């Protein structure tokens, strides 16, 4: 599973390298979410729901750079990319009980359950604290693991 996650992450990070005018994203935050698939839902139902969820995020969170779901057998891997930790905090606010995505988040639990959240990149204690507070509000019990950036770069095609 770790090999799959790191392979997916590597592919995302190098995907913008062929552009002549890439835009650097020095404080990008990447969140890798392991979701446990509800076996009662068909592949087509899952595809339609995740597409709707992705489109909603795309239309409401301008600093969310990517939101992709990946098939991992009994699990689904969701990779979220953010311009910075503030963009990730917008997502946390949106899934909170008063947020614009709270109902959609609750609906998502018909399709999968949360297994683990891994956060990597340019974040500070501010994001860790905000995620902890949000997890308590929403009732997440899955572990959150954090790996801060040491050095490197990320580019976008725009």
Place the predicted regions along the sequence by residue.
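Sec-dependent signal peptide recognition
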Residues: 2-7
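C-terminal motif of bacterial Sec signal peptides marking the signal peptidase cleavage site
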Residues: 15-16
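A beta-strand edge to alpha-helix "cap/lid" segment located at domain peripheries
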Residues: 19-20, 136-140, 147-157
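Active-site-flanking beta-strand signature of metal-NTP-handling nucleotidyl enzymes
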Residues: 28-37
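Short, surface-exposed ligand-recognition loops at beta-strand->loop->(often short) alpha-helix junctions
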Residues: 36-48, 123
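An amphipathic, aromatic/His-enriched active-site/gating alpha helix that lines ligand/cofactor pockets
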Residues: 58-65, 81-144
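Short beta-strand
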Residues: 67-71
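Hydrophobic residues embedded in beta-strands of well-ordered beta-sheets
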Residues: 76-77
């Amino acid at each position: 599973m770790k090999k799959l996650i790191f392979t997916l992450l590597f592919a995302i990070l190098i995907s913008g390298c062929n552009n002549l005018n890439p835009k650097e994203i020095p404080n990008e935050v990447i969140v890798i979410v392991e979701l446990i698939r509800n076996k009662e839902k068909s592949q087509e139902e899952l595809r339609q729901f995740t597409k709707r969820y992705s489109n909603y995020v795309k239309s409401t969170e301008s600093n969310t750079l990517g939101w992709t779901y990946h098939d991992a057998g009994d699990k689904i891997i969701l990779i979220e990319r953010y311009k910075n930790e503030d963009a990730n905090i917008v997502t946390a606010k949106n899934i909170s009980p008063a947020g614009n995505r709270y109902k959609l988040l609750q609906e998502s639990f018909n399709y999968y359950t949360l297994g683990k959240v891994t956060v990597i990149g340019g974040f500070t204690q501010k994001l860790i604290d905000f995620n902890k507070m949000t997890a308590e509000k929403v009732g997440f019990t899955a572990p959150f693991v954090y790996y801060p950036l040491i050095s490197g770069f990320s580019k976008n095609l725009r």
